[in-house]
Amino acid sequence: MKSDQLGRVLSDDDLPTKLSIANEFKAFVKKNSVPRDLIHPYFLTLSRAIKSREDPQLTSVCFSCFCHLFKRVSIQDKQLLDDSATVAVVTDLLIDRLSDRSTGVRATANKVLLDYWVLVPQAVAVAMRQSAVVSSSHVTLGESLKWLQSVFDLSSAFNFSAFVQPVVDMLRYPQLQSSVCELLKKVYSVSDRRELEECLAATGVNEMLKKSILNGLPGGNSSSAVSDPKTTAPRSLSSQKSVASKPAQQPNSQEPGNENAPSSSLAFLNSLPNFRVDSLAPENVYSASDLESKINNMHVAFADKESEKNWSLREKHVTQIRKLLRGNALQDYPSQFAAAYKSVIDGVLKSATSLRTTLSNQGLLLVKESGQLGGNAFVDPVMDIVFPQIIRLTGQMKKITSNNAHITVCGLLTSATFSTKLINHVTSATVEKNAQPRTFAAVWLRILILSHSQTHKSAMQNHGGLDQIEKAIAKGLQDPTPSVKENMRVTYWSFAEYWPSEADKIYRKLDTKAKAMLDKVNPSGAKNAPIKKPAPRESLKEVMRRSRESSVNRDANAPSATAPPQRAKMGAPQRTSSGLVGRSLSGSNLTDRSNRLSSTSTSSRDQQRAVSDSTRPTQMTRPVSGRLSREPSLTRSSRDQSLTRSSRETVSREPSLTRGSRELPKQRVDQNRQRVPSISRDSRYGQRPVGSRESSRQSRESSLDPSRESSLAPSVHSSTAISRESSLPRDDLPSYDVEMDEDDPFVTQQLKLSLKQEDAMSQPEETMNEVTTAEATATTAPMKIPKSTPPRESTPPNSSPFVLAKSPATQGVSTSPATGKSASPPATAEDELSRDLNGESKHLKEVDDDNGSMDADERIESDVVMGDAEESAANFEPSEVEPAGVQLGLKSPKRETPTSALQGNEQAEPESHDAVADSQSHGADSADLQSEPRNVPVSPPTTSDASNVPILSPRPIHPAKFELDSDAMIVDEVAPEVNTVIDAQTQAEETPTEEIPAVVKVGFDAEAKSEPTEQTEAVKTSDTATEPGEPVDIPNSEQGPSTEPTELAKSAGSVEHVTEAIQEDPFGDALPAKQENGAKASDEIETDHTKSNNTESDGPVSAHDESEPMEICDSDNDAVDNGTNPDTKCQDQQDSTTPPMDFSSHDLKDELNTSSPESLTALLSNPDQYKEILDHVPAELFLLCVILFSESHVMDAQSVISRDTNLALSTASSMVMVCARDVYPSDSRWSQATVEELKHVTVTCLEWLTKLVNESSEASTLLATNKRYRTSLVHLLSTSVELHKQKFGDVTHNSLIHVIESMDKLSQRPPDKRTSRAFLEAPSPSPDSSLVEDVTDKLSHVTVKENFKTIRILPPQLASGQLIFPGSEVTWSKLELERLARSPSCSDSNEAILDAVSRDKVSVTQLSTLASRIPELEDVDLVTATILAYLHISHPPALTTAALVAIKQVLIKPELKLSMGHVTEIFSTLNHVNSHIDSRSPLAAAIEELVADLLTHTDSSEMLEFLLLSRSRDSKTQNKLLLLNTVYHVITPDLLPSYETQLLALITELISDPDPLVRRVTVGLVVRVLRVSPEMEGTISLAIKSKMDLVRYYMGA
């Protein structure tokens, strides 16, 4: 068959013949080769048949033939497809098929194009670049992206440069963004991305979207994107993304200087899980009001406690805010978004602290991303609220929550602005009891140091932040938890990079082991660490060494080595005790234990603790947790050495009394012998440490060695002390806070064994005298102990009972802390106790000075105190007061201080230093443990400055209370001294809408009182005014508006009534002057005043109370009556004499519209005639003329209008809307006003509206109780928010948003039950407001075109079934086209405007200019396609309206012919726009009118088929309403039988829709179907069943 025959058959014959020929040709192509000269004609003929779209079946068969023909030719000869004419025909058809509605057709066309590119790559790529990737159909663009991905998968060498710009331009389509991002990441993962960066920058792609694309490429973010000053991401994000590909850094690397060493940047945050901003679908907003409405809708779910009902809503809202952060709100409305986020931060924190893990995670992610994406604008205002709660979450046991909270704090710290509060929040976590916050706090400190040490170095240093960080790091490096120390070491080196001198101070205070561990993580290597060798600490070590050597020498030279054993001399009972003690304290065993000292630092700490014990004042301390505190730094070596010395110092003495005795023996008093303090047995209930069993075994072995037994003597005083304590019940034993480890059973066992031999011990007088003489003559200078790391804070008692467990370093010279001289023992134990009690008050005040200034020689004292002192003090209870970490002593009964005790202090002798060295010997003199009594004051610990401060009184210091005088406050707030005079007439007329304090003296200060602009204009200064001290009374704001505003308004016309209003008493009683004329008004004012006090009021409230009368006197009122303000009175008299004008004789409305400014100024000069003028003209026109031509009387005009609250609110709202939208007739006064005049009118009306909403109780009650009325006003104002910003700027824009917010807040106010029901039944915006009627009510209904006549279907009139044919209604198109004729035009060409539209850079003026040129264009296909593609993107209402006007111009173009494909494309676009706007918006009416215009260009059957087959079941309410209304007007009697099934399915589905409006319109559709075809009633009744009663009601049956 020839090509011309095929073309003739496909164009002329009937449909069955065409289908038959097409199928035959397809069978021929499948089996036979095609002649070379017929290939191009065949392609051309089939292409024309497919594009004609005559029949869907024929189109499908022809396209199948086309594809088979292409396959046959490619098999036959590939060169045949390389012809330029063939390439043009084939590619044109295939690209056209990419936009087909059928998915299978689009997939086939895409596959054929890919095969064609393999054969002819250059030609096909050029065709795709010129047509497909720049198409106006987003469907074609999506298929083009698929084709490009397939091509790149086939060949990575594909030249993508020509496609970069159009592909980037596709990012303006939200539905294509994911595909574009995927393609770009795939292409530029193997290519140089500089071309992509340049293209993204030139196109102006959304910054966040650009970052998401570039971050997915190898290498992270680009330098240009990071350095872009417009980016809203914080500094930390840019730094972290620049190193995203680097491996995570490990702070504990074993190789210093490695790449895993600590870094000076914030790149380590990338290794933290969930720190990066994850991918989430963005959500865009269309205006600031849209954003605020979305946030306001979340307040209900966040309001109360979490429950099963609201937790899912909270999670949904939190996720929605996260999507909004990724949308356009952050770039277009940053300040409004930040304010909205702050308003819901409490609810977000409730979600973050929830026990539900999913909700908590979402809340924490939102808080983190608010800082990462929003920057410091989102973090700084809520810092004090967010940080404490999130830091508290890090201590939870649930690891997921604690880790997420840690990541959240990290994200906030990288975004917050530096302040000292930030450091306070972080350092507070370093002192938490829980280890987790302390571990995380090290990382937070590092972030602070790296972020702010360079830029805010002086601020950190001058405001205390540096000191806090330094203390926190020093504390963390010595923390008992390994993880805290591990993280803090890394933080230390970051700190040392910026503050080397402060870091060096911390380093020098560490011990050797801590320094070694710190050097391991040094980034510059341990060899370069600033190690400062401390001063030599060999003093204690040398003492121990000399002690061991002396002990060995004594054992070698002891006479007991060769002499017979002394067991017979000392008695049998000594054998067991001496053997056990001697064996356990043998020289070899002591040497082994001494070698266990880990380092010099340990000995140094013991020595420092000994100094602390020796310099502490004598006092008893309170118990700590019912047991003695354990000092971990005490080693077994020091305990053994103390035991050794104690055993060797003990000499044979007479037995002491047991605890049961309460009388001092006379012989002990005479000999002035001291007693050893008793040992407390409040141990850990028999716990045995490691090694104690071995010590017991060695003790038992030593008991069998007679030579060892003979070399030792029992400890007399230790056993005496134990005996004294053993007689007391265990529960009554006092607990002391000591540093020594008295829980060690090893020490306790030795003392128990010595106790058994207490009664059998005897000490000859000769031995005692020898020991005393030796100690008195062998006095040497005390040893010096170098300073070391301060031990932990702990307060030993004034007399430590564990003398046997003390280190030899503690047995130094006893000195007096008051005089610094040696202290001699008292005469008796009773004298010693008296001396302690007497000296306690003197020494306690000097503890801090002595601790800091005393030399080491003076601080080395003994820890031995008289045992009787302890016995006496044990009867007293310890104090429970422990302020500031300092423990106070016991409160002992008053006792007289004996003279002998005081004399004994003057005869003090220093203790011999040899006693310390000789304490290690194992000779027979081991019984000289406690030979001398000592008064040992104990110094407080030296861990910190705060702990060294002595607390002399437990009473807390309360802050001073400042009480302000109420009268003074009233004067400050109400009566500022300003020489002003208030116009009485103006104040009387403002009474219905203003609320000010009841009586005010003198006047108001502009800053002190937040009054509206109108009132401040009414305030005038005068040289002849009242004196500053003379008050001028102002009527009470609570008195207006009254229940009868007409009566009060009548009283505002003359001075007489004004005076009566002023003289009204604030408590309801009229003043005497001229009461008869104003009695009625006074009663009304008093009634309204009482009501206003009982209801809520948003206006300012007077500072006075009824129980406290204000300062008011008759002289003040007389001053007003006598004419204090003569100007006002004269003006009132002059106005009252003006004869009233008769307005009934001429057209006042026309006069206001057409008169000259001078005539209008004269006409509006008398405010007394305003009420009559308002009865003849609309309120909007009247107020407009007053504002423009008689501005001094604006307050009067507003007062007259405010008599009707409904009229006042409606007038102000409609004028605000009209000024922005220009919806006024061309011959009215509105059209003659300039933009600046309209802006002035808008500002004046907004101020008036603000005052009405916030200060008028009547207006606020009306808005709070009548939801329908409030919703109408809010909708009226919200539709012009964006227009205000574009036309007048941010001033009116922000004020309008404030008014809308104030109205919305009133919706949450509970209605007052005493409110009249007249408020609840108030009408919609005033009937007098004709403009409001035209713009709101008329535009909320459906507009369709049938037979070229406008038909409006009003839902209330569905019952009668009649259609209204109004003749003079104002439609949307008429208003917009009139505005289009008056709007300015630009000089850009059509091509330039279309290019701006395609790049989403077009303005409203350009769109309006393009719409005005459409009637002159011959070809509107390109314009239509470009505008339709533009409408697929969300835009502000002004741009959308202008684009719809252009579509309107296209649809009303004469002789326009549209195919069904064009109709469906336009309807789909309008339906898409309709789904993103409010159904109450005028744009909804615009779309309905455009659909009505579209129906005139299509066949009803095809349109109904399209509507019923292409409807989506998950569409929004707006789409359902548009579908129902369109079907309503497409239905005809001829079409019902063919589409009965589909129509019933639609009705059955939507009549049960959750939205009541959808159900109501569906009922209207059923009524229409039954009226068109009554025979379908049975079928419909069976389908909808119970809904038929409602249908019959509407039909009037």
Swiss-Prot record:
Output compositional bias ranges, type Low complexity: 577-605, 765-781
Localization per Swiss-Prot or TrEMBL: Cytoplasm, Cytoskeleton; Nucleus; Cytoplasm, Cytoskeleton, Spindle
Looking up Pfam families in the UniProt record yields: CLASP_N
Which parts are the HEAT repeats? 1537-1573
Polar residues bias locations: 610-622, 632-645, 709-726, 791-801, 808-822, 918-933, 1013-1025, 1036-1045, 1122-1139
- Asked whether the keyword Phosphoprotein is assigned, the reply is no
Write out the GO MF terms.
microtubule binding
Q: Where exactly are the transmembrane stretches of this chain?
A: none
The annotated regions of Basic and acidic residues compositional bias extend over: 535-552, 660-673, 694-708, 832-846, 1081-1091
Q: Which Gene3D superfamilies match?
A: Leucine-rich Repeat Variant
Question: What are the UniProt keywords, alphabetically?
Answer: Cell cycle, Cell division, Coiled coil, Cytoplasm, Cytoskeleton, Microtubule, Mitosis, Nucleus
Q: Where is the composition biased (Acidic residues)?
A: 1108-1119
Question: Which coarse location class applies to the principal site listed for this UniProt protein?
Answer: cytoplasm
Q: Which GO terms describe its cellular component?
A: cytoplasmic microtubule; microtubule organizing center; mitotic spindle; mitotic spindle midzone; nucleus; spindle microtubule
Region labeled Disordered — which residues?
A: 220-265, 519-958, 1005-1154, 1307-1332
Q: Which GO terms describe its biological process?
A: astral microtubule depolymerization; cell division; mitotic spindle assembly
The record's section on InterPro entries has: ARM-like (IPR011989), ARM-type_fold (IPR016024), CLASP_N_dom (IPR024395), TOG (IPR034085)
Q: Which SMART domains match?
A: TOG
Provide the assembly information. Interacts with microtubules.
Entry function = Microtubule binding protein that promotes the stabilization of dynamic microtubules. Required for mitotic spindle formation.
Name by which UniProt lists this protein: Protein STU1
Gene name of this polypeptide: STU1
